[in-house]
């Protein structure tokens, strides 16, 4: 699933729910919230289908770049695991900024804290992730 698939799913859901939305000013918020939920769902499914993905990619074993690809996938998995370990509110802020690419202002409105708190929490999250990932990969 790609980012385009996620966006398509969000707009399909909007189309299905269009008749139930009374305030068209809230569509932007609804879209952001639905996109966030789709991204979370993507990560849940990716985590659940990890073994299936490995089976589907057995042909990679003959690839000359296998070592590098395995290291990259392992690093991505470590980062995903560390993100999953974050408290829900911090994980939400991180995902909204890094994966959904929302502005600090948009995130602050969605989670109900000031823009400065969002910036501060993102700084702390990034520092924590760097520290924990570095420990796990032995850097």
Walk through the language-model features, giving the residues of each:
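Short, charged helix-capping/linker segments at alpha-helix termini
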Residues: 1-9, 17-25, 137-139
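Residue cluster at the C-terminal edge of the helix-turn-helix DNA-binding motif
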Residues: 17, 42, 89, 110, ...
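Arg/Lys-rich amphipathic alpha helix in sigma70-family domain 2
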Residues: 19-23, 33-54, 72, 124
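DNA-recognition helix of helix-turn-helix
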Residues: 36, 105, 110-135
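Internal acidic/polar
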Residues: 49-76, 103
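Short amphipathic alpha-helical boundary/capping segments
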Residues: 78-86
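A short pre-motif secondary-structure segment
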Residues: 93-97
